[in-house]
Amino acid sequence: MRLTLLGLTVAAVLLSQVPAAWAEEPPLEPGFVSIFNGKDMDGWDGNPDFWSVKDGVIRGETTAEKPTKGNTFCVWRGGTLKDFILRIKFRLQNGNSGIQYRSKEMDKWRVGGYQAEVENAPGKVGFLYHEGGRGWLVNVGDFMVIDEKGEKKVVGKVWDKDDLVKRGYYNNKDWNEYIIIARGNFIQHYLNGYPTMSLIDNDRVTDPKDPADRKGAAMEGILALQIHAGPPMVVEFKDICLKTLEGPFGKAVRLFNGENLDGWVPASDALKETFGVKDGVITDTGKPAGYLRTADDFTSYVLSLQLKHVTGGNSGVLVRCVGPDKVWPKSIECQGQTNAMGDIWNIDKFPMKVAEDRTNDRHTRKMHPPNERAMGEWNDYDILLNGGDLQIRVNNLLQNTATECEVVPGKIALQAEGSQKEFRNIVLVPIGAEAAAKPEPAK
């Protein structure tokens, strides 16, 4: 028994070093479509000298006898990508590769545009490159904003790069999974469950119909896989699944500037010392109970943020918060309690429809077991409100949904509820009619 307990303890420690959602293969949420059949190149178009299907995977290969004179690409012919989530696995034996999206075909099998980097180089794999355009864009670990003049500024971190390398976020010469999310001008990369970069691209939008116009942001384009010119190489891809997202999505807004609480209001004077800013994050002591809310109202949007449990206990993110400020305002609470992220609490009878089999009174449990990261690590919280529909994702796993939510402008609030939390990288991407009217681009 003692040996068994020791083994379980060691296993638990090891599992705590990886994102909980990835200890096992996470389920694919509804709406994903496989775009590679695992049998042949149907729907894909690349130079047959280099691209083929072998053992159920797309294989790109160059040899000393058969090199490529320049970068060459295998293009998905199923249409163009605008707003989407892409999940794709890759294995690189040697050389350099990439996954192109919102890209342009400049010539036959020659592509330019956003590229998720693929190379056997921890600390580099996961960054964002602009092939045939603006070049290197966002380093691993960075949250970048590009302004209207094309000037780049790192405004925060999605994860510490050195810590990613230490954790082994990349599996050298083995299978890895990218998740690439593009909504409006907000782009995110995840590798094996870890966030590797975020970008708000406020650069001028290029003409999607002009292959030569590549020095700017791209809102749509093709998907392709790269073989890089150079020494002989082998790269493989499989399990390619795409989910098209309903928009339109507007310009992303940073609700928290990383420096002060401009744009935020404590619910009462008693909370003035509860919330603060330190090292680019919003700190929350948890006491007294209450919340910090936005000064502005929002209706339909994606809210993307990172939340850290400094101590175990309760908190939450309130959306469509309406009425007078009080400890429990009428709203939808996206739970922030330790091991309960993804749960829904209905506060003050907010009109909405939830899954009856997971609901007890005002509380709707999440769909899957907890998938939060270890205490003291950042969790990615993604809350979508589009009209009456609500979706809550924790570390890229869809954990809860609701329908027929009352469509009303409301505040967004961060709760103080007895435990210490931190919040950062709070980004709002407006949806639908609100997308055309939403405010200043992110600074």
Question: What feature does the model see in each segment?
Answer:
Residues 22-443:
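Carbohydrate-interacting regions of secretory-pathway proteins
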Residues 6-17:
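Bacterial N-terminal signal peptides
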